[in-house]
């Protein structure tokens, strides 16, 4: 179970302590548990949603979104912000884009992107609460973190060394594809036709974002992986709320 705890420690702000420094093979296997961590997030958010019944609508949605951000520690939002800055400031140049991603400072485009994504998530949550479609809280985190597994399965990692390289090099690929299949099945069981719609929408957006990354970078980084997760979560919430 160590790979699960590695995944939970990396993807969440929950107080998880590991017995020591994980081996590269254990890091690679931790990717197999990313969808499960997403489902755990979804269950926690679904329970919180039920507990907030009777709370004024806007406050209800704001508390859900706050809990969502706190659960991940803002990790993927940071990747989204860095990617937004780099894509605009990189002017189509690969090395300049990668260099900007490493800059810890956030420019105006990063701030605007974060505001827009959080605003879209908030308004989608308002609509979903009104429509009593709480199952979307299970789907979005599951699909978002499943997408990270899918990304490492089909996309080169372009930064040599570090955690991302260990994940990419030691991911068990056959098991990874099986876990992705089980994740899709879980979405269908949890959401029915809405689950199928969410998976199809996320798949189309995933491959478009991957194509954009391949054209600019020739692969992915940790920051662009975080951006993919955030954008897919947002798309799933909006898709279920609108259709």
Swiss-Prot record:
Which GO CC terms are listed, alphabetically?
A: plasma membrane
Catalytic activity of the protein = alpha-ribazole + adenosylcob(III)inamide-GDP = adenosylcob(III)alamin + GMP + H(+); alpha-ribazole 5'-phosphate + adenosylcob(III)inamide-GDP = adenosylcob(III)alamin 5'-phosphate + GMP + H(+)
- GO molecular function list: adenosylcobinamide-GDP ribazoletransferase activity; cobalamin 5'-phosphate synthase activity
Q: What superkingdom does the record give? A: Bacteria
Q: Which UniProt keywords apply?
A: Cell inner membrane, Cell membrane, Cobalamin biosynthesis, Magnesium, Membrane, Transferase, Transmembrane, Transmembrane helix
Q: How does it sit in the membrane?
A: Multi-pass membrane protein
Name its co-factor(s): Mg(2+)
GO terms, biological process: cobalamin biosynthetic process
Tagged with keyword Phosphoprotein: no
UniProt record similarity statement = Belongs to the CobS family.
Entry function: Joins adenosylcobinamide-GDP and alpha-ribazole to generate adenosylcobalamin (Ado-cobalamin). Also synthesizes adenosylcobalamin 5'-phosphate from adenosylcobinamide-GDP and alpha-ribazole 5'-phosphate.
What is this protein identified as?
A: Adenosylcobinamide-GDP ribazoletransferase
Q: Which organism is it from?
A: Pseudomonas fluorescens (strain ATCC BAA-477 / NRRL B-23932 / Pf-5)
